[in-house]
Amino acid sequence: ATNIPPHNLTEVINGCIAYIDDPEIELSGLMEHIKGPDFPTGGVIMGHSGIRAAYATGRGKITLRGRAEIVENKDGTQEIVITEIPYMVNKARLIAKMADLVKEKRVEGIRDIKDLTSRKGMKIVVYLRKGANASVILNQLYSFTQLQDTVGVIMIALDNNTPKTLNLKQMIQKYVEFQDEIVRRRTAFDLQKAEERAHILDGLHRAVDIVDEIIATIRACKGGMAEARQAVMDTFQFDEVQADAIVKMQLGKLAGLEILKIENELNELNAQIKNWKDLLADDAKVLAVVKNELTALRDKYGDERRTSIEHVSGEVDIEDLI
């Protein structure tokens, strides 16, 4: 099953735009924009190697920690203040696990644990005994509880209805191609509707000069709308679509047709039709629309990254060895 962690909208859109601007962009270039997963609960991702492996292959593991700070008190005691916990970790269970570790004496030096979470944000305070080593205790909490968690990444998506594991660039490529298709299909639909409306307006434009004759012909037909439509087609050489639009109009409305109003609408439609045809004939223009729409989405909904990424001592990327 797919398991793609949440990402930052601004970063992902910037990555998509970078790909549109340069389809030959490499993974390292994309990662300048897409730093890594970004969880709504914040936290700290430990190291870049797990992120890079996941983005390069479509599979990987990322180490995620809660955000904790060691606070020195005036009386010489220390506290561990936790303000963020890993994504999908249950706060109550985390605190209960910490308490169990204290009872079992697997972690020593903790005198109390309090949940001081409020509307202002999360806050779990671990009060330490005087002389306790806060750094050691914090590392023990990382090791023995879900204050440090592993997030698996499996980037599986449907490609032509076939499940495939995709790396980051492939995922972005498929998404941009999909957006390209959406713009083309939407434009083709709008173009078709505009051409259909323009065709009817062409008929109405011609009907203005002979409106009295058309009304007389319609009134002379006693066999209903079908007979009137056929009579208009035969007498005035309108096609079926145009004749149908004319016959369906109320006679009073037909008599009051204004040629200037028809011409204005027709001119607007013809300009739109030209623009849409030009767009569909130019791949670069279609991608420009995709880019502009993504930019508008980013500007409206984008926000700052919540999850930070810390370099781990001794971590070496493959590129560093080349």
Predicted features, each with a name:
Residues 2-322:
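C-terminal interaction appendages of subunits in large macromolecular complexes
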